[in-house]
A protein has these predicted regions:
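A conserved active-site-flanking secondary-structure segment within enzyme catalytic domains
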Residues: 136-163
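Active-site-proximal catalytic alpha-helix in oxidoreductases
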Residues: 125-127, 170-186
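Structural detector of well-ordered beta-strand residues that form the stable sheet scaffold
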Residues: 120-121, 142, 159, 170
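Generic recognition of short, well-ordered alpha-helical interface segments
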Residues: 142, 146, 177-180, 193
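Catalytic cysteine-centered active loop of the rhodanese-like fold, especially the PTP/DSP P-loop
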Residues: 131-132, 167-168
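Thr-Gly-centered strand-to-loop micro-motif
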Residues: 76, 165-166, 172
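Extended, subdomain-level signal for the structured scaffold at the beginning of enzyme domains
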Residues: 2-120, 127-131, 148-150, 158-160, ...
Length: 243
């Protein structure tokens, strides 16, 4: 009987939020640019589009398909010029951030939409686009582990964590961290029960066969090898930030 009551209470909560969101939908804008890391985008999208009342907008400079880092082309649902007012912006990362930092139209759109959004968010190196738009000034933030030393260049201080919240700003770590980040946002907006229900719906219960997904659990040898692999990308990002 107690279990039935709990289920009924949770269903009531979910239905109430759905009703409220139908009256006041939440417009969520995902920002695309060439060579974006697709999981930075698709991970949070898969979670946040399930949030009660969410209306997702996949936005780019033009309606043309946007190439991602893995060969998957992503089709925008709208353009920067035609975007509605956004309650939340989500800026993914990827090696394409380096070129996007030099694209005034992309940075200006992030700046303008972020200034009026209730939630300003990024995944991975998307943090540097928020920073270039002046949206990380004085904020605690995170990004992909290889790039955390560059955060002060865009006015932010690095804070440890899979994802970091500072006021209305949420930043996620690298790539897969965007899924955890999205559940954190959902819990803050809709409550823990809704986040738990969606987590079960997508069966998000990661159990990788290896345990080296964070620098704290990787060997010194592995860290040295991967740090070398990121030398050139980090240098390119530093140069792009410095202009």
């Amino acid at each position: 009987m107690a279990r039935a009551n709990v289920a009924s209470d949770e269903r009531f909560l979910y239905d109430r939020i759905q009703t409220e969101r139908r009256t006041h939908p939440m417009n969520i804008g995902f920002i695309l640019f060439p060579n974006v890391t697709q999981l930075d985008f698709t991970g949070p999208l898969q979670v946040l589009h399930r949030m009660p009342g969410a209306v997702t907008h996949i936005l780019a400079k033009s309606p043309d398909p946007v190439p991602s880092d893995c060969g998957l082309s992503l089709v925008p649902t709208g353009t920067f010029a035609g975007a509605p007012g956004l309650d939340m912006i989500v800026v993914p990362g990827g090696f394409g951030v380096v070129e996007a930092l030099g694209d005034a139209e992309t940075v200006d759109f992030i700046r303008a939409s972020g200034a009026s959004a209730s939630y300003v968010t990024s995944v991975c190196t998307g943090a540097f686009l928020l920073g270039a738009a002046g949206l990380l000034d004085g904020k605690q933030a995170t990004t992909h582990w290889a790039y955390t030393s560059l955060l002060p260049l865009v006015g932010a201080a690095h804070a440890p964590g899979r994802w970091v919240k500072d006021g209305n700003t949420y930043t996620g770590g690298g790539v897969t961290a965007g899924i955890d980040f999205a559940f954190g946002i959902m819990a803050d907006i809709c409550g823990q029960q809704v986040a738990e229900a969606i987590q079960l719906a997508v069966e998000y219960d990661p159990a990788p066969p290896t345990q080296t997904g964070h620098p704290s659990r990787a060997s010194g040898k592995l860290m040295a090898m991967m740090a070398t692999r990121y030398d050139d990308p980090v240098k390119a990002m530093r140069a792009a930030i410095s202009g």
